[in-house]
Amino acid sequence: MDKNELVQKAKLAEQAERYDDMAACMKSVTEQGAELSNEERNLLSVAYKNVVGARRSSWRVVSSIEQKTEGAEKKQQMAREYREKIETELRDICNDVLSLLEKFLIPNASQPESKVFYLKMKGDYYRYLAEVAAGDDKKGIVDQSQQAYQEAFEISKKEMQPTHPIRLGLALNFSVFYYEILNSPEKACSLAKTAFDEAIAELDTLSEESYKDSTLIMQLLRDNLTLWTSDTQGDEAEAGEGGEN
């Protein structure tokens, strides 16, 4: 199938909410080796975000059931095996995306904006791996995530307006990484607050086409800050989960 047909099919799959098909189409487009247009880049991102999102959500539900069935040996074993099956799917999806990023997307990114977008994506998918990692593996995965976010963060500060939706989305997800993966609420709050304040200070630089995206992410940054600064014990597990880009 040629590139245009694959992109058309991906859009059709998106409308049908068949995200596995959508991801497969955009994976094929990426493997053709040319740099993706903004539209193609967004299709790829939306497809995999939905594909991995379904597994992350299932994993959280089954993990919680597994913890609650302590003492009921049979039920707990069934939940554990099911969680492990979901984990395998989740890892395969993340490794798929990370391999596309390493082989094609990051090396081919000619603009700072694309580079930041793909490095953020790399940080995100290592973060999803970190959520289900245990033991010796975990530290290496967490480091990979942090390095990708950090590199993206430095480029974004140098090359993009504080109101740019990609720069804001990166700050949002990097702060969630600090809060949830590194358990550093102070660092998470400081990063989110700085990003929010810098964007507010330059609201007049907001372009018409990104106005909606930017203000939505600013709202998410503020929601997370509210949640994290109250930091009540009961909110711990959920904090930041709604607030991701």
From Swiss-Prot:
User: Per the record, what is one GO cellular component?
Assistant: mitochondrion
- Domain of life here? Eukaryota
- Residues the record lists as N6-acetyllysine modifications: 3, 68
- PTM section of the record: The delta, brain-specific form differs from the zeta form in being phosphorylated. Phosphorylation on Ser-184 by MAPK8; promotes dissociation of BAX and translocation of BAX to mitochondria. Phosphorylation on Thr-232; inhibits binding of RAF1. Phosphorylated on Ser-58 by PKA and protein kinase C delta type catalytic subunit in a sphingosine-dependent fashion. Phosphorylation on Ser-58 by PKA; disrupts homodimerization and heterodimerization with YHAE and TP53.
Q: Where is this site: Interaction with phosphoserine on interacting protein?
A: 56, 127
Task: Tell me the SMART domains matching this sequence.
Answer: 14_3_3
GO terms for biological process? angiogenesis; cellular response to glucose starvation; ERK1 and ERK2 cascade; establishment of Golgi localization; Golgi reassembly; lung development; negative regulation of innate immune response; negative regulation of protein localization to nucleus
List UniProt keywords, sorted A-Z.
Acetylation, Cytoplasm, Phosphoprotein
Q: Which of the residues bear the PTM N-acetylmethionine?
A: 1
Keyword Lipid biosynthesis on entry:
no
- Residue numbers bearing the Phosphoserine modification: 58, 184, 207, 210
The GO molecular function terms of this record are: DNA-binding transcription factor binding; identical protein binding; phosphoserine residue binding; protein domain specific binding; protein kinase binding; protein phosphatase binding; protein sequestering activity; transmembrane transporter binding
Establish whether keyword Ubl conjugation is in the entry.
no
* PTM sites of type Phosphothreonine: 232
Q: Where in the cell is it found?
A: Cytoplasm; Melanosome
Q: Which family does it belong to?
A: Belongs to the 14-3-3 family.
Function summary: Adapter protein implicated in the regulation of a large spectrum of both general and specialized signaling pathways. Binds to a large number of partners, usually by recognition of a phosphoserine or phosphothreonine motif. Binding generally results in the modulation of the activity of the binding partner. Promotes cytosolic retention and inactivation of TFEB transcription factor by binding to phosphorylated TFEB. Induces ARHGEF7 activity on RAC1 as well as lamellipodia and membrane ruffle formation. In neurons, regulates spine maturation through the modulation of ARHGEF7 activity.
Assembly and partners are described as: Homodimer. Heterodimerizes with YWHAE. Homo- and heterodimerization is inhibited by phosphorylation on Ser-58. Interacts with FOXO4, NOXA1, SSH1 and ARHGEF2. Interacts with CDK16 and with WEE1 (C-terminal). Interacts with MLF1 (phosphorylated form); the interaction retains it in the cytoplasm. Interacts with BSPRY. Interacts with Thr-phosphorylated ITGB2. Interacts with Pseudomonas aeruginosa exoS (unphosphorylated form). Interacts with BAX; the interaction occurs in the cytoplasm. Under stress conditions, MAPK8-mediated phosphorylation releases BAX to mitochondria.
- Name of the protein described by the UniProt record: 14-3-3 protein zeta/delta
Protein source organism: Mus musculus
